[in-house]
Amino acid sequence: METKDGEYTKYNKIGDSDFSWQKDCSESIRNQQNVILSSPTGSGKTKVFLEWAHTQQEKPIIITAPIKALSNQRYRELLDAGYTVGLETGDIKSVPDNCDFICCTQEIYTNKYSELENVTLIMDEFHYIFKNPSRARTYIDALHDSKAKNVLLCSATLGDISKLKEYVNRVSERDFFAYENDSRLTSLFYEGNINSNDIRNSLIVTFSRRNIKNILYSLYSSRKMQDDETLEAIERLAEDDKIDNYEFLNNARKGISGYYGGLLPKEKLFIEKCFEQGMIDTVVGTDALALGVNFPVENVIFTQLAKYHEGPISKNLFEQLAGRAGRKGFFDEGHVYYCNDFAGFCEPWEYDTKDLFGKILEKSNEDVSISLTPNIKNILLDRRTIEEEVEFISKFSTIEVGVDETFGYISDMIDYIKNRAFENKVNRLVCERFGNDYYYDSYTEDEQLNENFEKKEIYRQELLDRKEEFLQNIARVYFDEYSPERNCEIFTEIICGIEPEKILQKYGMSGNFNDMLQFRKYVKSLPKTYRKGLTKINDKIREIDETAIDGFRGSVSVEEISEKLEQEGKLDAKSVMQVLKDQKDMQRMNERADKLKIEEEYELEDC
């Protein structure tokens, strides 16, 4: 192993072992109403912002996160600390009365809680707005619209904090106090190259699924099978969690695993459990690991420092990933390496990993860069005009926005939704049913041909007669995670009475598992009138991975039970009483799950 050869010594960070930065920060922000807290990954930000939150009088304290797994993780941590905690994501809602904390995704806060006034808001992992422009909008809308009494933005190091402060003040019309820290709780050493045979207790970073697979193959070839006791423990856990992926399990038997978006939630949970219990010591993943998935490791190892189409990664992302090394309470220090053994097939050919490693250490952190996407739903709901939306995007994007181009794009989308989308889809539905060959010919003697044409036109008119219903409701059902085209296509099919099973197959079952989960979110967002038959997506998901919906919180929701009874024509007085009983049973199970602190953790974003 090549360590501490002196080449990168000047970049090492010595740990703040006496927690002095936390003490100083707590004193500095104690009496501040609105705070930006910028501090490196692994520096102990959580302790500081929780102390600040407790000095505020407004309850509950709402903590947002960019992905569900992080909300679940925070929820469990606060439960373990003895607080009354609510959890609300796209799949689970459990919010007790008078709770101390509510943990939720950023979208949930923006769409549901931003109007609450006497609350304290903590927006965690705020640096996510720079990683994902399409998701940045929900953060900026929350900052702009939030009526919370106190707000704290918590983030990893972000370039010139004075520029971030100026931007946040402008968006929120608040006066934020900014506190910047560059200290860690444990020392971090930048070491250079590491031999692949020496890799243990590590996060290995790469940027493609293919690279993950190749790295795992290489590690598997060089490692020995673990001892019998560990293998038996892995088998028991796999049986309990219903894991049957042979390649996946075989890697775990040698203490290694990949971690990426294509894994099922139960597989991700299995990896996390194995890691916590010491049965896996090395995880290979993408830069999504920068979002805080909890793998306490001693080493972070880069197999590439440039992406194929984007070039070298940013200094901000590098530090967020490198900061995962040496988590306090697990290791006394952390180490950051690159690995030439893997860089040969991971790094794009035009780059040299050692060269990039040195250059990125010399770089300064990048300043804030935000490019906002349009909020089409706001316009459809008449919350903003097109002109106001363009002004909002132009005002709060940090890069130059082409006003005329943006206005043209949004205008075209709104025109498409209101004037073209329904008719276009109806024409396709007619063709799918009758084909393109039928036309009316007054000279033909083929009566069957003309009869089919008449049927086709009658069917077309029947569908077109439903346009008013489409126009009256598209704003209500518009799903921000889908494109305008997909929103219009699916809702037109629902309005036109296309069989739910066909809609399920086309939009809910044709992609990967994450697409199924996204379609489920869409269905849940629909008014009850339009959900008929589509809630079967829950059963389809459960067949693949029941933990994605249920965790340990019961098998079927009351809402689902009610809808099924109604569909079956059995929603009579006796059935209603049964539903109420099921509701009490469900509440009892959920309370027991909270008490035992066994809430499932699962991540649904693509990693």
Describe each PLM feature range:
Residues 380:
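Catalytic adenosine-cofactor/nucleotide-binding cores of aminoacyl-tRNA synthetases and other
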Residues 1-375, 385, 393-427, 434-438, ...:
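N-terminal helicase ATP-binding lobe
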